[in-house]
């Protein structure tokens, strides 16, 4: 949720953010009205309670002959207090609903526009030039015995797969390398739950316009997470953190689940867009004034991992209209995919400012000991999709694939060849 002080002091900035996202600026006016109504309801209830308290004192001091009339007045006042408190509770609920309907306020540097209006910040490496017709990752993966889409579909349906043999080792190697780098950079390694309560899923902002992407277990009213960002965001819900020594950094290793409800017909081949994958995700709690610097650090750690797998990539500043509701700014790292002759996302890192922490009531104490809302950030350190970039960029004319040196200790070989 956004800061209501910003809303009251500069509603035009919030309206501009909504327009930049391609969302309805009228939601800002609805929130302003709900905020005003709630404050009026609180004032009415407070005044009536004060009057009721004064009446109680008056009755205690009144002569016997006056008490009957005062008691009747007190009963009338009691009814009004209950009505005012009910109105206040209703106003609280209306304010909360209006507050949650609004996306985070984008930062000033975010590019305007939609999905195709990103800004390329840097291009790293050069796409390989093959003297043969390169294969796509699925053809390579199946020929090398790394993945089995057909049996994945037989067992679970479309967009499911088996990673087999060295394919499984390649994924485990990626995730273990990411875990090692995370720990070396001061992160606490976590294996979180992948089922969360509705309030945690809602708190991270995933039950808004992207709710259709989330798997819901109706009988248990639990949600399967699409990223370990969700349980890690809920880890310190309703707590006051000590950030005096610096940010709290966690790296979550989990399976992730996405319905891909809006992706019918897109990336149906291979493992680029699937319902289940594994990922190591960085998650940080920090103070709001340090959030932008921390965002740059997360990007730098992602770059370290991408350098380790030796693939060409670019960094983009995602446009406002393509941001998730909780992100105030997002950088994506996209690797070159030879079979598609384009770049595809491998990592994203988002600065969510105080949006998630306000929803989840995560605070810290400032230098005066006063509780303040924390800031949260997240970023990908490795995921299943990286296998696509590794196979396609490191393939050779004979159909084998070179294993990046950093992954050789995990995979057990420096070249992937078809099984004998």
Swiss-Prot record:
InterPro entries, per the entry: aa-tRNA-synt_IIb, aa-tRNA-synth_II, aa-tRNA-synth_II/BPL/LPL, Ser-tRNA-ligase_type_1, Ser-tRNA-synth_1_N, SerRS_1_N_sf, SerRS_core, tRNA-bd_arm
Gene3D superfamilies linked to this entry: Bira Bifunctional Protein, Domain 2, Serine-tRNA synthetase, tRNA binding domain
Pathway: Aminoacyl-tRNA biosynthesis; selenocysteinyl-tRNA(Sec) biosynthesis; L-seryl-tRNA(Sec) from L-serine and tRNA(Sec): step 1/1
Database matches in SUPFAM superfamilies: Class II aaRS and biotin synthetases, tRNA-binding arm
Cell location: Cytoplasm
Amino-acid positions noted as binding ATP in the UniProt annotation, renumbered to this chain: 258-260, 274, 345-348
UniProt keyword annotations, A-Z: Aminoacyl-tRNA synthetase, ATP-binding, Cytoplasm, Ligase, Nucleotide-binding, Protein biosynthesis
Root EC class: ligase
A Pfam family it matches: Seryl_tRNA_N
Assembly and binders: Homodimer. The tRNA molecule binds across the dimer.
HAMAP family: Ser_tRNA_synth_type1
Name recorded for this polypeptide: Serine--tRNA ligase
Protein species of origin: Nocardia farcinica (strain IFM 10152)
Encoding gene (name): serS
